[in-house]
Amino acid sequence: MATSMAAASGRFESAKSIEERKEQTRNARAEVLRQAKANFEKEERRKELKRLRGEDTWMLPDVNERIEQFSQEHSVKKKKKKDKHSKKAKKEKKKKSKKQKYEKNNESSDSSSSSEDEWVEAVPSQTPDKEKAWKVKDEKSGKDDTQIIKRDEWMTVDFMSVKTVSSSSLKAEKETMRKIEQEKNQALEQSKLMERELNPYWKDGGTGLPPEDCSVSSITKVSVVEDGGLSWLRKSYLRMKEQAEKQSRNFEDIVAERYGSMEIFQSKLEDAEKAASTKEDYRRERWRKPTYSDKAQNCQESRESDLVKYGNSSRDRYATTDTAKNSNNEKFIGDEKDKRPGSLETCRRESNPRQNQEFSFGNLRAKFLRPSDDEELSFHSKGRKFEPLSSSSALVAQGSLCSGFRKPTKNSEERLTSWSRSDGRGDKKHSNQKPSETSTDEHQHVPEDPREKSQDEVLRDDPPKKEHLRDTKSTFAGSPERESIHILSVDEKNKLGAKIIKAEMMGNMELAEQLKVQLEKANKFKETITQIPKKSGVENEDQQEVILVRTDQSGRVWPVNTPGKSLESQGGRRKRQMVSTHEERERVRYFHDDDNLSLNDLVKNEKMGTAENQNKLFMRMASKFMGKTDGDYYTLDDMFVSKAAERERLGEEEENQRKKAIAEHRSLAAQMEKCLYCFDSSQFPKHLIVAIGVKVYLCLPNVRSLTEGHCLIVPLQHHRAATLLDEDIWEEIQMFRKSLVKMFEDKGLDCIFLETNMSMKKQYHMVYECIPLPKEVGDMAPIYFKKAIMESDEEWSMNKKLIDLSSKDIRKSVPRGLPYFSVDFGLHGGFAHVIEDQHKFPHYFGKEIIGGMLDIEPRLWRKGIRESFEDQRKKALQFAQWWKPYDFTKSKNY
């Protein structure tokens, strides 16, 4: 006993320690937030200083001119493209204008020939021909001005008075015209549909339901006969209250105007309630706590009586309106016990609608009370299905009606509207019945609250929305529709199954069937919800439409096929079915999809597949199924054969390819976003650009240069290696290389070109570095590099250690997709080395050799030393002066 108490006490923890732990968590969270805020502010200050210094906008004047030239060429190309489309129209216009001009000249010549010829004496200094020509021309022009030429109306209009029209106003006019046209088409289509409409309430623009006035009158007639005018008096009370609020008058004065005095109205209401009450022992029966067997028996009997009533009902049966199903769910927060799916008290009340329809005077009395904060009146229900009154409201209900008339509040106003709510019984399939049908229920739903009316109109106008609201706002607490909205977990399903077994053992088959239906609906809902894409924060980002492609290591790109059929659902942890591989003791297939692949498909898969992919597949299968092998009887080969014969889900391969393509695209986009050498990147240093070609540009390093004149040749597009470049890009790189060699040669310097291609998966931008060296050091450079390459990397390598580039360049010496290091000495060839182990090979290998030759401190070639913006600008201006005589990008032939 003592040990059990000690064990039990060991699980307790003092409030002080709990509070201390919470305080530590709060302090740690505050510290993290403070640090993040400080880092953010520091980054913002750095960006602001960078902007003020002009690092984002300043560029060399020559580079700026080159960019403007590119933009002009681009605009000219676009203009030419536009002109090409409008060339035909212009030609036709010219032909018309020429034709009109020719006709005009013919008319003028006819008029001049018909007029009398005037002879003028010639002046000696002028020839008669010239004078005559001038005279005739003058005469023609005078006649044309007076008779023929007449200005058009548009030429005389004052353009300052003309109203200007913007493109937005034109778009708005077009949009309105389109809407008007669409409305006309809809009206024509609607009129054609109305001619064939059989429902009289749909014809002539109806809503499909009888008018509300008719329904109200019919309700009042029926209610007066059956309930002694109780519903009419309640509606009268609501109308008087609304009138008092609108006119800002006293409620008792309005009651006195209509009924003489408050006492008369109270007496009428009491008489009507007595006439409507048919069962005196309803309250006693309701508050009696039944046993479990009584509950089950009452539930079964009530359901059977409901089925009989439903079967014998005639055409006068009236189904309640749908808006009763869409009321607030707050009216069901009172009794949590009755909300459970297996609650038999709820079942009993559902199965006896006649009892739920009765209104006692005490219940009505509680409606006129001003509700307090700690008091929850349970008179609020959906339809006439009332929850049990609390003790406080039951005591108050015993008082007189006089003390019940108090100042109404907003909450009481909303709760009073539940008088007119109709019964919410029935399944979802009964909710679409016509409201013109009548039922044995005593009251019909009449929306008195204007919010209810607007809700009714919305539901009538939009049937799909109504169905959705009916599903999501189901009011029965124990109904399976309400609980099947969320996906049930495994534990919840197990508990539900236990409830089903328990109900079957107790003989409550109705409850068992209900729970089974709920479980089935939950399973179906889970299957449908898996096909809906999950919402995440990515949706807030701008969506892009891209062509999904796969790229192998050699740079080959091919588009991803879209899956022809939808992907089959996994359906839990089911075992995959085996495909028959043998027929009549002969092997007919190895893999599950052998029948679907042709020889061309197999060849394509073999060409597009790489050794890395095969190694991944082999390692995954070996690690997953190695434990299943048992020596001589089931070896590793047998495991691979049986695994290959398992059937995969339909469309699984296409879906995997699509996911890989999406992952590749995202990684490439992220790499290009933070790339230092892409023009579209936000981190691109524009002030370091020296010259821009067609597909290649020349810039300076973003860190301190190894030697004076250290520069970079970089492709404009995001290319990874020289072995993956196109011919025109490689040729332009060689043109920059020749110009740089010539420039440094005139200065008495030698230069070395380096390229390191590593980490193909990370997709770094290709950089071709040019480092100038003194002549005597440049002559010794091949010896240093040859010795360093021979001693680098693994001792035993798969590839040749040293590749000579004197006869062939790097693109013809190293296969595509392999990581490599290359060095070129001026315009002569150099050496290349295929990197065996990328993790051990340093990315600064070439710079380290040059640093050793020039005795440079290691921090310059390891990570680089940052420079200020002013130092970088001076460096760019100096290099631009050197480069200007050798800049081939400004030549006209380029």
Swiss-Prot record:
For bias type Polar residues, the affected ranges are: 320-330
Instruction: Give a GO cellular-component term.
Output: nucleoplasm
Where does the record place the region Disordered? 1-147, 270-483, 561-583
What Pfam families does its record include?
Answer: CwfJ_C_1 (PF04677), CwfJ_C_2 (PF04676)
Report the domain of life of the source organism. Answer: Eukaryota
**Compositional bias (Basic residues) spans?**
76-99
Ranges in coiled-coil conformation: 13-107, 166-281, 502-530, 644-675
Classification via InterPro entries: Cwf19-like, Cwf19-like_C_dom-1, Cwf19-like_C_dom-2, HIT-like_sf
Q: Which UniProt keywords apply?
A: Coiled coil, Isopeptide bond, Phosphoprotein, Ubl conjugation
Residue location of crosslink Glycyl lysine isopeptide (Lys-Gly) (interchain with G-Cter in SUMO2) = K171, K604
Task: Give any single GO term for biological process.
Answer: mRNA splicing, via spliceosome
Q: Where is the composition biased (Basic and acidic residues)?
A: 13-56, 128-147, 270-284, 332-352, 410-430, 440-473
| PTM-bearing positions, type Phosphoserine | S75, S360, S372, S479, S484
- Which stretch is the leader sequence? none
Spell out where the chain crosses the membrane: none
By sequence similarity, the record places it as follows: Belongs to the CWF19 family.
**This protein is called what?**
CWF19-like protein 2
**Species of provenance:** Homo sapiens
Q: Which gene encodes it?
A: CWF19L2
